[in-house]
Amino acid sequence: VQPTVELAKRNSQQRIDPLIEESAELRHLVVPARSRDSGNTVLAKRFPGGQLVLTGANSATGLRSMPARYVFLDEVDAYPGDVDGEGDPLALAEARTATFGHRKKLFIVSTPTIRGLSR
């Protein structure tokens, strides 16, 4: 989860796609986006056994209705306090892991912004 959907798209295009292209093993697992039924888009990378879904903390739609065992929240200090009147995006993302109980993993990282107020 990036701070915005636009940042998620940029991260996908500038980091994730080149990573897949440069790794023979990943290239073999992730079907190219140009393949019609690949399941590979800018914000979703499907591979055997799972998928990588990217979204923004500014999108309530992107933070609901999808169980996730692993959630990586990046630059959380840039997240809005409330998203679309549905609450804290950090809490919304964490709710996606409820299905997995003690097997869930949340990775929360950020560049600190304001001393004493950073998440």
Tell me what each language-model feature is.
Residues V1-R119:
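Phosphate/NTP-binding elements of NTP-utilizing enzymes
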